[in-house]
């Protein structure tokens, strides 16, 4: 089906794309400074309306910086009252398309209301929502990024005409991509959103009708133009050779196998030395190696060879664990280096890439949440649409692949659909077939190499049993290990998270409707259990009320320690927590009492259900819900006590503050409480390093002042005898290839993006070299980047 016909059957042969530039984000109090509307007929531009508007208020320098529209430019422009009738006439009854159509629609409605005009009820389409859904794996969804993705110029973006033109063109591309999907997916999404009035609803309906009419079941109306290559989390290589047939020289040497078989492979003598040291570390009964290997040495290939060699005795030694800090390195190791090395050597290997279980989608929980869309608001519905599309393609179930979901900033929804300890059990999730995390856990026990991140490795320290029994660990990017250790041994208390944990076990919550209906069936024949459930509902309400009061009072008592005018708030350390919380002690005591009541009632419910179903075969869902709820509320109670009482001298306590709804009448300070072990090194030594026979810690930067002492002390290796230390310089000629410049002028420029930008431009013109400029402020970086683009 060609484009013209597709638009016709979807009732989009005529549509109008719109975009407004405004003095701010508030549709009631801010004003429009530029409008653009472009008419499309059969996918071709036929007419346009573009007009600067005098808002009769001053345009801030911030808005001028974004749009390029100055007060001088709009001084002689017509006011909104002078253009509104012509603009509304131009819009007519056509469907309206916008990028985040809610923004433009709200400004249009307020404009009409303010000037006493009726507005035609248009069918609305949103390219932002569509892009998040059908391009769910793209990293960015702003108009400029999407324009470049589809090959349209983004020059002049944030001016209404350019943005409107690109919105219309992008919309057509997105329609074609959406129409490439089969009826099952399109109908599923339509059924999910049909009860709420949201943009693109009619598009899903029209595509479904046309697919039905055409009798297409497994294919779409058109073919997709997108080629997707989705990541995997398991890698198998059958391999005919034994790894014992190779050594470092035959693999990495100047006449070695990698040199012969891999394009652009460079012989590096230190790579061979590094590889031999790793093999020596893993051959000893007990050995820990700390090796600094400069960038470009080829350390990942070298330690992967060591891991494959070490794992050849998998039955006796278990798998080799490889841990790194960044996702980029994980992807490089698993999707590039490991396959390349094992296939080139043709050796057998079974490898798995594992993340913490909350990174994975639980199909059961997702089905429960989406089966009753009435419990979700419009924003929730739109945020979840990308998940439906991503599920058609994912091979891993790793939610981080679905950027479209996270782009909506409804991250709390992740906690409603991710795999959950104590909930995602075989008895529940087996019904959904191919449970992502459960399937991966089974593969772990067959793998001889397991790639994880530092965070999961530290979770294993605190709660052994996530990984199979193993004796050998390789830690790359080891300079970041201590940060992950602090994060693991840290306690956080926020009102939002605490409320979520309490609501999770609330039978009266709309999101508990599915399991609550099962509970109601049991209660109808069990008056005693019914009474306990009512007591639980009452206790949960009291806990939520006391939580709100407690956090408000903590915020009020500590308001003076924070400043709403500051971008970055202080994080005051609490030297005496009993004194800090003395004034709100009654609130804390009440919160403690309510949490204990909930735990006691959950215990009674668990006991009652077990008496009815002692084989756990009939009400598996309820068993899991209340067991998990008991663990979560108990953990919440423990955190509250740790943070507000019984101060530990080996722990640092602090609070953080964030001003919500800034610069509005509803502005408020939200406080969160935190605690962390001051020095996790002792814990690391006892519960981590002492557990294993062989450990390699490596990175490009481990030494401080040419010594490993600081690093060894921080990670708990200072007093261990079996630590081997070695460093290798980078093979790059930094002194010849790179020069470092630091500004030391008398004028302070660190927060002045124009002066920084001019300095960068001058240096670029002087040296005529590629440059890397380092910033510590994202805001300054962004503003400087814009300034350079506009002035270079």
Predicted feature residues:
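A substrate-engagement module of RecA-like helicase motors
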Residues: 230-235, 248-256, 314-448, 510, ...
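Acidic two-metal-ion nuclease catalytic site recognized across multiple nuclease folds
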Residues: 1-10, 173-250
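A contiguous, basic/glycine-rich beta-loop/short-helix subdomain that forms a polymer-engagement track
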Residues: 415-448, 458-464, 598-744, 751, ...
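Conserved non-catalytic scaffold segment of RNase H-like nuclease domains
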Residues: 1-123, 136-158
């Amino acid at each position: 089906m060609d484009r013209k016909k597709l638009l016709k059957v979807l009732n989009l042969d005529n549509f109008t794309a719109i975009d407004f530039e405004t003095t701010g984000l508030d549709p009631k109090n801010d004003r429009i400074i530029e409008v653009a509307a472009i008419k499309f007929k059969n996918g071709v531009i036929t007419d346009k309306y573009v007009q600067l508007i005098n808002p009769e208020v001053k345009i801030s320098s911030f808005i001028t910086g974004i749009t390029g529209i100055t007060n001088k430019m709009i001084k002689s422009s017509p006011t909104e009252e002078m253009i509104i009738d012509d603009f509304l006439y131009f819009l007519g009854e056509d469907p309206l398309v916008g990028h985040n159509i809610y923004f433009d629609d709200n400004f249009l409605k307020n404009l009409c209301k303010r000037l006493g005009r009726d507005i035609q009820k248009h069918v609305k389409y949103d390219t932002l929502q569509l892009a998040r859904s059908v391009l769910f794996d793209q990293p960015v969804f702003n108009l400029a990024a999407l324009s470049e993705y589809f090959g349209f110029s983004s020059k002049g973006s944030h001016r209404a005409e350019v943005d409107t033109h690109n919105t219309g063109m992008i919309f057509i591309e997105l329609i074609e991509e959406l129409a490439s999907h089969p009826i099952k997916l399109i109908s599923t999404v339509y059924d999910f959103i049909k009860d709420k009035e949201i943009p693109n609803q009619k598009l899903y309906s029209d595509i479904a009708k046309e697919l039905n009419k055409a009798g297409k079941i497994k294919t779409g109306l058109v073919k997709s133009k997108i080629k997707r290559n989705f990541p995997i989390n398991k890698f198998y290589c059958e391999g005919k050779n034994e790894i014992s047939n190779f050594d470092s020289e035959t693999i990495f040497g100047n006449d070695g196998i990698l040199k012969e078989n891999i394009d652009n492979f460079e012989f590096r003598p230190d790579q061979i030395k590094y590889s031999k040291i790793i093999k020596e570390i893993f051959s000893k009964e007990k050995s820990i190696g700390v090796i600094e290997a400069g960038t470009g040495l080829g350390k990942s290939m070298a330690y992967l060879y060591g891991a494959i060699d070490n794992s050849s005795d998998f039955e006796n030694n278990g798998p080799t664990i490889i841990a790194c800090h960044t996702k980029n390195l994980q992807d490089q190791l698993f999707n590039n280096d490991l396959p390349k090395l094992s296939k080139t050597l043709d050796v057998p290997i079974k490898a798995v890439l594992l993340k913490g279980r909350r990174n994975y989608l639980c199909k059961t929980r997702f089905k429960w949440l989406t089966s009753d869309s009435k419990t979700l608001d419009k924003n929730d519905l739109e945020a979840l649409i990308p998940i439906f599309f991503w599920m058609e393609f994912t091979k891993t179930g790793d939610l981080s692949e679905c950027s479209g979901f996270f782009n909506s900033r409804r991250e709390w929804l992740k906690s409603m659909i991710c795999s959950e300890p104590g909930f995602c059990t075989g008895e529940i999730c087996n019904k959904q077939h191919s449970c992502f995390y459960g399937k991966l856990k089974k593969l772990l026990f067959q793998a001889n190499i397991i790639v994880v991140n530092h965070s999961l490795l530290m979770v294993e320290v605190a709660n052994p049993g996530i990984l199979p029994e193993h004796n050998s660990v390789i830690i790359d990017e080891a300079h970041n290990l201590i940060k992950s250790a602090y994060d693991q041994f840290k306690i956080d208390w926020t009102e939002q998270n605490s409320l979520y944990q309490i609501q999770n076990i609330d039978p009266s919550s709309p999101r508990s409707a599915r399991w609550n209906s099962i509970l109601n069936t049991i209660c109808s024949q069990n008056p005693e259990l019914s009474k306990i459930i009512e007591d639980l509902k009452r206790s949960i309400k009291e806990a939520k009320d006391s939580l709100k009061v407690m956090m408000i009072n903590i915020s009020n008592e500590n308001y003076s320690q924070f400043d709403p005018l500051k971008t970055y708030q202080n994080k005051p350390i609490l030297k005496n927590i009993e004194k800090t919380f003395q004034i709100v002690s009654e609130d804390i005591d009440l919160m403690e009492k309510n949490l204990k009541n909930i735990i006691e009632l959950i215990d009674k419910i668990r006991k009652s259900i077990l008496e009815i179903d002692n084989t756990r075969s009939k009400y598996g869902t309820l068993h899991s819900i209340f067991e998990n709820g008991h663990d979560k509320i108990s953990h919440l109670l423990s955190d509250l006590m740790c943070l507000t009482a019984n101060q530990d001298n080996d722990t640092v306590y602090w609070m953080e503050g964030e001003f919500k709804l800034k610069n509005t009448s509803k502005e408020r300070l939200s406080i969160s409480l935190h605690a962390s072990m001051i020095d996790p090194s002792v814990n690391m030594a006892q519960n981590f390093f002492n557990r294993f026979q062989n450990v390699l810690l490596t990175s490009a930067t481990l030494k401080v002042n040419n010594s490993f002492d600081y690093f060894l002390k921080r990670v708990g290796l200072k007093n261990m005898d079996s630590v081997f230390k070695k460093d290798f310089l980078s093979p790059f000629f930094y002194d010849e290839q790179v020069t470092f410049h630091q500004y030391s002028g008398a004028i302070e420029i660190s927060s002045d993006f124009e002066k920084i930008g001019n300095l960068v431009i001058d240096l670029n013109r002087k040296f005529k070299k590629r440059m890397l400029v380092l910033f510590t402020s994202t805001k300054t970086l962004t503003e400087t980047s814009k300034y350079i683009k506009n002035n270079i």
